Amino acid sequence: MHSFDVALLTDRRYTARHAAEGDWYLRNILDDDRLLQAALTRRGLTSVRADWADPEVDWSRFRCALFRSTWDYHERFAEFSAWLGRVERATRLCNPGPTVRWNGDKHYLADLAERGVPVVPSRFLERGSTRTLAEVLAETGWDEAVLKPCVSGGARHTYRVNRERAAESQSLLAALLARESMIVQPFQADIARTGEDTLVVFGGRYTHAVRKVAKPGDFRVQDDHGGKAHPYSPTDEQVELAEHVAAACHPVPVYGRIDMVRDNDGRLAVMELELIEPELWLRYHPPAAEAFAAGVVAFLAENS
């Protein structure tokens, strides 16, 4: 007998039921989760928030475990990977385990490119590689680039580098490659000028969008680094691309977020596809919570 239908997965930092005065970060998380929980309740589903890493949780009590704000997983990736294997034997994961494993490593961008999705060009440097940054930039012709881990979030170890000072950045790259695989991408000037547009999809269908803008003098649009997000009305071209990306996933995800920019040649290109624990800004467009809940109902019906 299941005690609850849905576990909304968070991490230990965000398990409080109420945000302290001035804690806008937790307040945003709770606002989004409450919108989703209310929509689930209207469809007859019970739900509770739970720390994914809590060893006391009996996951067999839930019909499914739904990823929401597990924002420390990339810092505990080995632990998280082992947890996935255990929990998917006890309950259903949403999005499913294979999708989570695929999307947890930025090598997925190469798969999307092979499936005809326009993505920002990427070069992968595997852990232990001795390739230099100067070699990569010379080979690609990129004057400026962004360096980040293949398994990451919140702009962890994300650096803007350039060809002129590549030698100075090499010790940093070497230290990172000693621990993990890295991705190098050309710096996209449109991020600094305009920002990054983020489109949300449920069951492959677009619902709403935001524009993320970096603070002056920075290129990182994450709120951890002073970035801001605002409601945004995307173009038809952007909506078409977002739904094309969702259709290129196998299976089509229950929920997802597609981050895109105008690349340095003026073409629309995907920066990231977030299928594990994306912030979805339901509070900016509450009807999206209804689409999300409907997707969870359909997921449970298909996987009962």
Residue ranges and their predicted role:
Residues 71, 155, 215-216, 274-284:
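Glycine-rich phosphate/pyrophosphate-binding beta-alpha loops
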Residues 11-126:
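Conserved N-proximal alpha/beta basic substrate-recognition cap immediately N-terminal to
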Residues 116-145:
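Rossmann-like NAD(P)H-binding beta-loop-alpha module
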Residues 2-7:
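Extreme N-terminal starter segment of soluble prokaryotic enzymes
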Residues 156-250:
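Phosphate-binding site of ATP-dependent enzymes
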Residues 236-304:
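ATP-dependent carboxylate activation and anion-phosphoryl transfer catalytic cores
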Residues 62-67, 198-201, 267-279:
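A short beta-strand motif that forms the metal-chelation/ATP-contact edge
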Residues 53-62, 132-140, 173:
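Short amphipathic alpha-helix with an adjacent loop that forms part of the alpha/beta core around
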